[in-house]
Amino acid sequence: MIKNLLITFLSLTVFGFILYHLGVFDNLNSAGRDERSLHSEKRTETVRKTPEFMIGSVYNSIDIPAAESVKGAMLASEILRSNGMKIKYITVSNCQKRPETAAALQKMCVDYRTGAFLGPGNSEMLTSLRAISQFYALPLISPVTVRPDKLPQLEYDNYVSIFPPLEKWIDAILAHMKGNNIKKILIITPGDGTYGEMFSSVLERNSKNVLNDFQTYRMTYPHPLRTNYFNNSLTNYGGQHKVDAIFFGGVADELPELMQILKNHNINLPVYVSDDIIRNEIKMPAGTAFKLFLPEAEVPVSNAKWMELYVKKYKKQPSYHAVLGAETMFVMAEKFNKSIYTPESFVKAIEHASLEFNKKIKIRIIDFSTGKL
């Protein structure tokens, strides 16, 4: 009996040893790992074998910050190629809705030759696009989005932004308000999930730490009924509470309506907006007397050749969104090392570079009526 058991045990041991050397248990181990790790390993292996550093972008061509950042990044990639770097920048520009954008990103994710994704160009798309790219272990490097407070924490976070953090923008706005002796503001903001709502929340929270005796009154409006909300809030708060200024967290398309209501009610309070509204989007109603202040980033250009070619090609100075797109491309090219590339190590390298880069960026407040600080 014992002899038979011993023979059986030895037979199983030898059989297991043979299976081990045939690699059968390797497949079982792989099946037990999480899928993200498998995608990461596959991307690492494929990117290292691919002749070119492949970068993708998906954006809406009518979204000015996104389009400008891609324009800057594209020109930067052309300079890198002319300098001998093997780099390929693939863009998809006709994605106006979330499902289209998500589908285009997923297509890039499953092409494991893609080493990084430059984007997204819209903060409202961030959560869903981050989830997709996180699953497929594709680094998500954005020139023009900020990290929301409510963004879920992940063990392996694949998202990095080169864009200045919200606090930097808000500190500049609050410092400008303090310099103009503003102590009471009416915050008019769109609903949850929008960039304006996120910006307004941080502004309201940080104002209490920066300005003494600072008071905020907040009104959140739904898009379909915004005209009534604008009217009620401006007549009630503008007169009854005597606020010193208004902060508007909406988008450029909504600003003229707000301005017209201010004009109709003869309210000449200064209006501050977020970085989501840029100069060439603004159309002021005729005869407006109030001040409009908007923040702009002063971003240093690291590559003189890029600036020279941009002005020559587009016959104008680049927007800061275009510069951020270019600098993101240059940073990714600098930190990419094919022989040691992994999605995780690449993200860490970009994170460190982003912190250093943001130290060089200054935020200034522009008076739209004069174009001066």
Language model features: what each stretch is:
Residues 2-373:
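Extracytosolic ligand-binding ectodomains
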